């Protein structure tokens, strides 16, 4: 994806496939607000009358398809994420991947660290409109439980920190202990969430204003 028009077209395609705006946000690595804006723009493109273009959201799109589409590259990045965790944190029992993109990364990390593998589906995957707090996420029963275990959390990007915070809360609610989070890209410069350190391979820093 090279420009906003590509993102709008992708958002339209995903919406036509029945994905919620929260799932679209996850697929395109943008915030929920940006996903909503992209979907609205894709519908506006079919309007017969010209309309004033709405101001776009303040967000950064991260396309890591070159990593995700290659098994070896994904493994190498997973090793780098695992190395970040080993440098500054204790040993975990479970590596929890946040669905969807965080799970393949967590698989590589768990293999490198020799932990079991957990998977968490965040509330945003059900989100289309309204208050996210009215929705709930959950752990997959097909993966390792977190109760009574020390956990690492893995995702691809940090946009606002909402999903990481939700996952941290969910692990604690299940009786587990979140030790640290790790991502490929941090858009916000997040160092910790609710007392849990957040590590990233890449930090995106805005310089000046658009």
Swiss-Prot record:
CDD domains per the UniProt record, alphabetical: PRTases_typeI
Keyword Transcription regulation part of the UniProt annotation: yes
Classification via Gene3D superfamilies: 3.40.50.2020, Homeodomain-like
Listed GO biological process terms: pyrimidine nucleobase biosynthetic process; regulation of gene expression; UMP biosynthetic process
Region (Disordered): 39-60
Annotated InterPro entries: GcfR_halob (IPR053401), GfcR-like (IPR022854), PRibTrfase_dom (IPR000836), PRTase-like (IPR029057)
Classification via Pfam families: Pribosyltran
Disruption phenotype: Does not require uracil for growth, is partially resistant to 5-FOA (5-fluoroorotic acid). The deletion mutant loses its ability to grow on D-glucose, whereas growth on casamino acids is unaffected. The mutant also loses the ability to grow on D-fructose, D-galactose and the non-sugar substrate glycerol. Growth on the pentose sugar D-xylose is not affected.
One of the record's GO molecular function terms: DNA binding
Biased composition (Basic and acidic residues): 48-60
Regulation acting on activity, per entry: Interaction with effectors modulates GfcR activity. 2-keto-3-deoxy-6-phosphogluconate (KDPG), fructose-1,6-bisphosphate (FBP), 2-keto-3-deoxy-6-phosphogalactonate (KDPGal) and glycerol-3-phosphate (G3P), which are intermediates of sugar and glycerol degradation pathways, can act as inducer molecules.
Function of the molecule: DNA-binding transcriptional regulator that functions as a regulator of central sugar catabolic pathways. Is both a local regulator of specific steps in the pathways for D-glucose and D-fructose degradation and a global regulator of hexose catabolism. In the presence of D-glucose, activates expression of the gene encoding the gluconate dehydratase (gad), which is involved in D-glucose catabolism via the semiphosphorylative Entner-Doudoroff (spED) pathway.
Entry text on domains: Contains an N-terminal DNA-binding winged helix-turn-helix domain and a C-terminal regulatory domain (or effector binding domain) resembling phosphoribosyltransferase (PRT) domain.
Name the record gives this protein: Transcriptional regulator GfcR
Organism encoding this protein: Haloferax volcanii (strain ATCC 29605 / DSM 3757 / JCM 8879 / NBRC 14742 / NCIMB 2012 / VKM B-1768 / DS2)
């Amino acid at each position: 994806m090279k420009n906003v028009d590509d993102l709008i077209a992708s958002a339209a395609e995903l919406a036509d496939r029945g994905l919620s705006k929260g799932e679209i946000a996850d697929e395109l690595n943008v915030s929920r607000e940006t996903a909503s804006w992209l979907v609205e723009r894709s519908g506006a493109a079919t309007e017969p009358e010209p309309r004033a273009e709405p101001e776009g959201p303040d967000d950064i799109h991260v396309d890591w398809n070159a990593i995700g589409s290659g098994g070896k590259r994904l493994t190498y990045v997973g090793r780098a994420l695992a190395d970040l965790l080993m440098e500054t944190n204790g040993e975990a029992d479970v590596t929890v991947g946040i669905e969807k993109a965080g799970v393949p990364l967590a698989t590589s990390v768990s293999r490198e660290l020799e932990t079991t593998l957990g998977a968490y589906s965040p509330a945003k995957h059900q989100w289309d409109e309204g208050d996210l707090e009215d929705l709930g996420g959950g752990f997959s029963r097909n993966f390792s439980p977190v109760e009574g275990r020390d956990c690492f959390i893995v995702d691809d990007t940090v946009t606002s920190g909402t999903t990481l915070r939700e996952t941290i809360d969910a692990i604690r609610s299940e009786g587990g202990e979140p030790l640290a989070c790790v991502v490929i890209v941090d858009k916000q410069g997040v160092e910790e969430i609710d007392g849990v350190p957040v590590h990233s391979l890449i930090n995106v820093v805005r310089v000046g204003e658009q």
